[in-house]
Amino acid sequence: MTITGIIAEFNPFHNGHKYLLDQAEGLKIVAMSGNFMQRGEPAIVDKWTRAQMALENGADLVVELPFLVSVQAADFFGQGAVDILDRLGIDSLVFGTEEVRDYQKIADLYTEKGAEMEKFVENLPDSLSYPQKTQSMWKEFAGLDFSGNTPNHVLALAYAKAVAGRNIKLHPIQRQGAGYHSVNKDVDFASATALRQHQKDQDFLERFMPSVALFEQASKVIWEDYFPLLRYQILSNPDLTTIYQVNQEMAVRIKEAIKTAQSVEELVELVTTKRYTKARVRRLLTYILVQARENVLPEAIHVLGFTEKGRQHLKSLKGQVNLVSRIGKEPWDAMTQKADQIYQLGKPSIAEQNFGRVPIRIETN
């Protein structure tokens, strides 16, 4: 049987995600971000709600990406997620992308010339942002051009790099309907960005979300809910460079900007430079919010939920893969657990995220 991996955020889960799961074959394993997203923001609804949405709509097994994999630039995000899925035995990786290319050929190219390609990136001037450097590399070695508004294509290239040299086939699926950041409401498939923006529009949600009731019952948060906490962390920390990935230049800019910024958005605008993209700045602010430190990634994989088919697969992995199904009895990842506690501060109604929580079981799919 084919075992298909999907790397996702489901922030929130929508019809485009359901379409992706429908296109996947065999047993479907999702490696999903926890409560903080790749581009440096809190998830609109918590990880358990999103895992349940996925399981109700075609996923067989949902596991959690640790905080220091979830909140990373595309390459590290892709690498960390593929590592986890590889250990769970996937033989193909399905992903949505704005432009379907021969990603397999790109992965093979990276297998062959990876060292040379990374050397090329290292030698580029530091005035360029990391995404600009990566794009120059792909242009140079694979003749790829970027239109700018294609974050899924950028992630797809990160996945191609991550599967290089592994026995995993890449299956790109053409992204349906609205673009990643689109807030357009007149499309067949709305983007997660649009759903977050129109979260109070009942008709809109019902048109584009398969698990509306779950979404509506869940506590919802946005970055601004954490702004007072972020501000406190910045003002009370005498040395921000002790925080993961915060260098002297960024520490100075953030300390200066917090004096006048009235919102997270304003803070991001003030700190962003040509070299430091908004996504990178948001990630740094997320690290500051949760006081992230450089840490080894957990050996074990945290299971958020499964169907009967997923349970059987987990059973077959016993003894080969270290799995955690209940945090408390077994510790998992201190960094992620701390991030979850801080996520809960966004709204008093957010449920406990770890202790005593057991995987969601969906009997039928």
UniProtKB/Swiss-Prot annotation:
Establish whether keyword Iron is in the entry.
no
Q: Which Gene3D superfamilies match?
A: HUPs (3.40.50.620)
Mind listing the UniProt keywords for this protein, alphabetically? ATP-binding, Cytoplasm, Ligase, Nucleotide-binding, RNA-binding, tRNA processing, tRNA-binding
* Catalysis: reaction(s): cytidine(34) in elongator tRNA(Met) + acetate + ATP = N(4)-acetylcytidine(34) in elongator tRNA(Met) + AMP + diphosphate
EC code = 6.3.4.-
Q: Give, as one word, the top-level EC class.
A: ligase
What GO CC terms are in its UniProt record? cytoplasm
Pfam families per the record?
A: HIGH_NTase1
Positions bound to ATP: 7-20, 96, 152, 175
Which terms in the Gene Ontology molecular function aspect does this entry carry? ATP binding; ligase activity, forming carbon-nitrogen bonds; tRNA binding
Location, primary (coarse class)? cytoplasm
Compartment(s): Cytoplasm
Q: Which GO terms describe its biological process?
A: tRNA modification
**Protein task:** Catalyzes the formation of N(4)-acetylcytidine (ac(4)C) at the wobble position of elongator tRNA(Met), using acetate and ATP as substrates. First activates an acetate ion to form acetyladenylate (Ac-AMP) and then transfers the acetyl group to tRNA to form ac(4)C34.
Name the HAMAP family on file. TmcAL
NCBIfam families noted in UniProt: PRK13670.1
The family annotation for this protein states:
Belongs to the TmcAL family.
This protein is called what? Answer: tRNA(Met) cytidine acetate ligase
Q: Which organism is it from?
A: Streptococcus pneumoniae (strain 70585)
Where is the organism placed in the taxonomic lineage, from the top? Bacteria, Bacillati, Bacillota, Bacilli, Lactobacillales
